[in-house]
Regions:
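A cross-family "folded-core" feature that marks the main globular domain of proteins
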Residues: 1-321
């Protein structure tokens, strides 16, 4: 999955062990060596290091090494998002990216001095995020003047997803004021949504009754983050089909609105959302049904899901809210 490049090598290995542990709670060293290119001793030391963190953070997962492999043990209160958050906080690569997004004018020299890391090392770490850049249709500027190149709306969407990663307890009420502030800050620094970009966004979501310029983007944030209750007329067929489906009778109108907001993100932006990234151990049958209804009732559904390979994960998340 695309976000794994944000982790350092050790943390990425632990995440892979966790993912393998979802299929079988015991993983042999042979399998881990093929997957992670680490020796058995290195994997054992990683497990011991994680035990120290787990004793303090209580995230609900432990990796217990033995002579032949690793046993993955989960407690009842285990949360995948909390594990990811703990691993992410250890990552210098993530810190560098976050700083660059928060302050687009910061230079590689300033980052080098602040973190006591060579300039080339910082550049290599940012280059190592190539899967992320490609997924969000962004790229690095070779001379590091602007560093991250691409549509401003895409950069803000990436910021939104990375901010969600830093809220493992899902306190999403802080997202709207944060995104409004960072959007205004970036605009004041000259990183604005251009007239051409506004036209591109409107062509992707023509049902929106406002222009997606800087002012319109503020209103879009309110919609995406649940402050504006609005369902376009083109979703009437979807709404009727959803409410008539016996398996979905227990869900309210608010759920339909949440689904539209999710669809709107898929329409407007490239890149996996955090809801798409986390894969539930067992998919709700209702989520799979919802995908089928969307394919039939949502206009141009195939077009805006073409670049999103894990849409059902998002449906699962929305239905469990």
């Amino acid at each position: 999955m695309v976000y794994q490049c944000l982790l350092e090598k050790d943390e990425r290995t632990l995440w892979r062990i966790y993912l393998l542990g979802r299929k079988s709670t015991f993983i042999s060293y042979e399998e881990l060596q093929d997957e992670c290119q680490f020796t058995a001793k290195k994997i054992q030391r990683l497990c011991e290091w994680w035990s120290e963190i787990e004793n303090e953070k209580k995230s609900g997962i432990d990796f217990v090494p033995s002579e032949t492999g690793v046993q993955v043990q989960l407690t009842e209160h285990f949360c995948e998002r909390i594990l990811w958050h703990q691993l992410l906080t250890q990552s210098l690569t993530f810190q560098l990216l976050w700083q660059k997004l928060m302050d687009p004018l910061v230079t590689i020299t300033q980052l080098s001095q602040q973190h006591y890391v060579a300039r080339k090392t910082i550049w290599r770490r940012l280059e190592g995020l190539k899967p992320l850049w490609q997924n969000f249709n962004l790229r690095l500027d070779d001379n590091f003047q602007n560093c991250i190149m691409g549509l401003e709306s895409q950069k803000r969407y990436l910021i939104l997803q990375l901010k969600k990663m830093q809220l493992p307890d899902e306190k999403e009420d802080v997202l709207l004021p944060f995104m409004k502030e960072i959007s205004a800050t970036r605009a004041n620094l000259g990183f604005t949504i251009s007239q051409m970009e506004s036209k591109i966004l409107h062509s992707r979501a023509p049902q929106l009754a406002y222009h997606l310029d800087e002012r319109g983007f503020q209103f879009l944030l309110q919609q995406l983050l649940g402050q504006e209750i609005w369902l376009p007329k083109c979703y009437e067929t979807f709404r009727v089909t959803f409410t008539d489906e016996p398996q979905l009778k227990s869900y309210s109108e608010a759920t339909i609105q949440d689904i539209y907001r999710y669809h709107l993100c898929l329409q407007l932006f490239c890149g996996d959302s955090i809801e798409e990234f986390f894969s539930p151990p067992k998919q709700l049958s209702e989520a799979i049904l919802l995908e089928s209804i969307s394919q039939k009732c949502v206009d141009k559904y195939t077009r805006f899901t073409r670049k999103h390979k894990h849409v059902v994960n998002g449906y699962d998340y929305v239905l469990k809210k």
